[in-house]
Amino acid sequence: PAGGSIHRLPMYPDSLNTQHIIATITLSPTAETQIEVNEISRLFQYENEAGIVYLEPNKQKDHIRSTLNLSQADILRLQIKECKEANPSITFSYTASSQQYGYKTGNRLFIPTNIFKKGFSVPRAISRKYPIHINYGYSDTDSICIKLPDGYIVEGLPKPIDLKSKFGNFHSSIYTKDNKIYIVHQLFMRKGVYKPGEYTAFLDFRKQVAEQYNGKIILKKE
């Protein structure tokens, strides 16, 4: 139209479309928990999250709750900070609680490794006829600290892995120190169009990442 102009959104390197979650999880001997979270999303990841600012406060909490792979979760406090600059970002700071962080069997607690990747999906296995489209690349980093309940020790941890593929990379580390478990998950997905014949390799990569996200930690009562 006359007097109008068309603006093209800038293209950013995949590695700049980031989401970083820092979480501290305090666990009780009965699998109750309190969780402190700081989550910041930038650029295209910001665009995925920015709609939350238009919701009513109770709906905002519902949205956050829906992203957690955690039953009986309650969002006790939520603060949202939106930064509309050349490199926009949105930050969620919240406290969550649950009466059931994992489950207890006898003298053992089985707890999740990462509750923040509920939305990570593995496509179904099919005979692929069309190319695989990854529309935008991104980088996710989850840094999680789990404080062990009194009287419990670690009996089993998921094995850390390093995956490298043409679709992206994944790194996990997990270790214990001073009665705490430290977990880092780093996922990088690369934008691109891939041949149908590469679908099996794509599925295998996603499955291995999902296994890490869905891993279980075993705690045993001393």
Role assignments for model-derived ranges:
Residues 1-222:
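A sensor for short, sequence-defined functional sites
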